[in-house]
From Swiss-Prot:
The protein's name: tRNA uridine 5-carboxymethylaminomethyl modification enzyme MnmG
MF-aspect GO terms: flavin adenine dinucleotide binding
Cofactor: FAD
An example Gene Ontology CC term for this record: cytosol
Length: 630
């Protein structure tokens, strides 16, 4: 049976990638269908109840700058907020929030249900309709066919999902949800490289059975940070503390003596797990010299006693889980509400994707999230937004878009994936970005919101707020530049008294602010200026203090951009380019980079090879000009 009306974009999956993809497409005015196996789990946080962190909050802020839902949903559900790396420079500062799992999901669903141009339908997708290497629609579990020329797949851990607890395993997309088996078989028929990855989650604990008095309390920050550029602290629900405890020698002994019952170490699990979020058995094995590991006890919400013990993800048998949990200080009488488990699932080599996240072999088929080999809500949401945007652009007959590495962490994420691929779940860090001084979480809106407005992602309310902030920054910079402080005046003496810095001649306030010992708030206090929007003040201070470094980075970007953006023809024959080694010819032929910049980042492709490619392109261009003139 065919559904009575046609859509322009269909999104499969209602997790963090799927919701952002569907919302982005619909915001752009495109008729969009979100197909989910269960409406009740839209926006569900399958693993830890937290958003943000090092590198990850940069992605959340970029999603927000492009009109996405994740940051606002976090502000409305966050029960603890902290700024990490607060004593370090602004490039690596990161906001992290504990979220009430139930509130977060409810907020996401409310946003979805109130989004114009978006339809939601509950059914699993079992098949894709593909004709002449072009996607035409999808077929659901009950045989209902939906038609659209663009489909975004955001299957998470559901594609061929297999759950492991000890040496026992069963099919599942996550605990309590069925896997996508029929779709997994269908996807393996396509000419795409497929692999298996693994992730895991810890047992959940009943908070009433925990002794917090022997743990270290970890409260949130004051004043309370916000995640969204449109957010404010008044949105936050009641704030609570997290708690810290540690594993010990007894814990490690329990785990080590039961590794033969671990599916990871007995060869039952084939998929590779996340390097930067290892299971507790992996930690004990890899870091055998460590006497203890931190365990962060995180509340799951305000209306539940469930706790998430971050740091002891495990797939050991239940009896071992119970023993190891009860060996930890403060959890001697702990009751496990849900056992921990590992899950294996299919993913597809992201090198088979374009920058738009459209597959190279099936027109109109886009991938986002864990299907591309990433891990994390934030990485999924960022890909979902980009895939949904490009699916909508395709429906509108417009050029696809992806930010460059020097424009956004989203650009770094996508470029890493489609150029290098991944053999393990990919996680974002600030260290992955070459230009992190200009890719800060605090300026994501200044980098991306104008582009978002051009694409059709930004509504009038957000645009007005952005313009007010942008104009406010410009006005304040001009005011500081044109306001002078002279020695031996009341203002000059106030500056000397405040900062202990003598004034040898007159200075503009902007010159003074550039000094390392001078802060914006203190300068305004000393010189009698008016207090302004804190976001505006923050941008003015950072831009002024880091102006020299930022200018150098911008110059470097400008130098590299000419060759970076040089397009490589789709039909280029690398075997015909003399001077390229067979190895490099093979790597270029396999990856099929879209630009010279992308080619330069393929492991093993040397600067000399890039020079040969550039010469070849110039010769090819000159040859075509001669043909045309003849």
């Amino acid at each position: 049976m065919d559904f009575p009306s046609r859509f322009e974009v269909i999104v499969i999956g209602g997790g963090h990638a799927g919701t952002e993809a569907a919302l982005a497409s619909a915001r752009m005015g495109v008729k969009t269908l979100l197909l989910t196996h269960n409406v009740e789990t839209l926006g569900h946080m399958s693993c830890n109840p937290a958003i943000g962190g090092i590198g990850k909050s940069h992605l959340v802020k970029e999603i927000d700058a492009l009109g996405g839902a994740m940051a606002l949903a976090t502000d409305k559900s966050g029960i603890q907020f902290r700024v990490l790396n607060n004593r370090k420079g602004p490039a690596v500062r990161a906001t992290r929030a504990q979220a009430d799992r139930a509130i977060y999901k409810a907020v996401v669903r409310e946003i979805l249900e109130n989004q114009p141009n978006l339809w939601i339908f509950q059914q699993s997708c079992d098949d894709l309709i593909v004709e002449q290497d072009q996607v035409k629609g999808v077929v659901t579990q009950m045989g209902l066919r939906f038609f659209a020329d663009s489909v975004v797949l955001t299957t998470g851990t559901f594609l061929g999902g297999l759950i492991h607890i000890g040496l026992q395993n069963h099919s599942g997309g996550r605990a309590g949800d069925p896997p996508s088996i029929a779709l997994a078989h269908r996807m393996r028929e396509l000419p795409l490289r497929v692999g298996r990855l693994k992730t895991g989650t810890p047992p959940r604990i009943d908070g009433r059975s925990v002794d917090f008095s022997v743990m270290t309390e970890q409260p949130g920050d004051t004043p309370i940070p916000v995640m969204s550029f449109m957010g404010n602290a008044a949105m936050h629900p009641r704030q609570v503390s997290c708690w810290i405890t540690h594993t010990n020698a007894r814990t490690h002994e329990i785990i080590a003596s039961n590794l033969d019952r671990s599916p990871m170490y007995s060869g039952v699990i084939e998929g590779v797990g996340p390097r930067y979020c290892p299971s507790i058995e992996d930690k004990i094995h890899r870091f055998a010299d460590k006497e203890s590991h931190q365990v962060f006890i995180e509340p799951e919400g305000l209306t539940t006693h469930e706790l998430y013990p971050n740091g002891i993800s495990t797939s050991l048998p239940f009896d071992v889980q119970l023993e190891l949990v009860r060996s930890i200080r403060g959890m001697e009488n702990a009751h496990i509400v849900r056992p921990g488990y590992a899950i294996e699932y299919d993913y597809f080599d992201p090198r088979d994707l374009k920058y738009s996240l459209e597959t190279k072999v099936i027109g109109g088929l886009f991938f986002a999230g864990q299907i591309n080999g990433t891990t994390g809500y934030e990485e999924a949401g960022a890909q979902g937004l980009l895939a949904g945007t490009n699916a909508a652009l395709r429906a509108q007959g417009r050029e696809s878009w992806c930010p460059r590495r020097d424009e956004a962490y989203i650009g770094v994420l996508v470029d890493d994936l489609i150029t290098l691929g991944t053999q393990e779940p990919y996680r974002m860090f600030t260290s992955r970005a070459e230009y992190r001084l200009i890719l800060r979480e605090d300026n994501a809106d200044l980098r991306l919101t104008e582009k978002g407005r051009e694409l059709g992602l930004i509504d009038d309310q957000r645009w007005a707020a952005f313009c007010a902030k942008r104009d406010g920054i410009e006005r304040e910079e001009q005011r500081l530049k044109s306001t002078w402080v002279r020695p031996n005046t009341p203002q000059g003496q106030a500056v000397v008294d405040k900062f202990g810095t003598p004034l040898s001649h007159e200075y503009s306030l902007l010159n003074l602010l550039a000094r390392p010992e001078v802060d914006y708030a203190g300068l305004i206090e000393a010189t009698g200026g008016e207090q302004i929007d804190p976001q505006v003040a923050e941008q003015v201070e950072i831009k002024t203090k880091y102006a020299g470094y930022i200018d150098r980075q911008q110059d470097e970007i400008a130098r590299l951009r000419a060759s970076e953006d040089t397009c490589l023809p789709v039909d280029i024959d690398y075997t015909s380019i003399s001077g390229l080694s067979k190895e490099i010819q093979g790597k270029l032929g396999q990856t099929r980079p879209q630009t010279l910049g992308q080619a330069s980042r393929i492991p093993g492709v040397t600067p000399a090879a890039i020079s040969l490619l550039l010469i070849h392109l110039k010769k090819r261009g000159a040859g075509r000009e001669l043909e045309q003139s003849a």
